[in-house]
Amino acid sequence: MARMHSRRRGSSGSDRPTADEPPEWSEVDEDAIEDRVVELAEEGYDPSQIGLKLRDEGVQGVPVPDVKLATGKKVTEILEENDAENELPEDLRNLMERAIRLREHMDRNPGDAQNKRALQNTESKIRRLVDYYRGDKLDEEFTYSYEDAKDRLE
């Protein structure tokens, strides 16, 4: 199947090995993992960054290769339970940040047709994601606009 905004096909990659339980060398208490997840969220880390930190640094010096295997919950579920989640989903937030950067670039370089198209594609993805999240993680009346995105992220 082709990519969304190009005619290229996707490249296949390796799959993560399936596992039903965490490895023996990574035995950390579930509560300690959840506390560390909330602590990292309060420091300003996104859920994907929290997963990387736990994988690389771990909890109490012991790496946690997969939070869901260790706790039975995803990082975002842990954040929701502890009221530490962001107001915007991470993927939508990242796309909005990209759109803001592209819009500022277009203001400085109005003749840059390639990045004008990149901005259009990014804003299309944002609108598509807003439709997906509207009513669940976003308000029913939420609509994307550059000014609104800039206010929310700064």
From Swiss-Prot:
Transmembrane segments: none annotated. Residues 21-32 have a biased composition (Acidic residues). Keywords: Ribonucleoprotein, Ribosomal protein. Gene3D superfamilies: 4.10.860.130, S15/NS1, RNA-binding. GO terms for molecular function: small ribosomal subunit rRNA binding; structural constituent of ribosome. It comes from the Archaea. The keyword Transferase does not apply. One of its GO terms (cellular component) is cytosolic small ribosomal subunit. CDD domains: Ribosomal_S15p_S13e. Residues 1-10 have a biased composition (Basic residues). Residues 1-32 are annotated as: Disordered. GO terms for biological process: translation. SUPFAM superfamilies: S15/NS1 RNA-binding domain. Belongs to the universal ribosomal protein uS15 family. Part of the 30S ribosomal subunit. This is Small ribosomal subunit protein uS15.
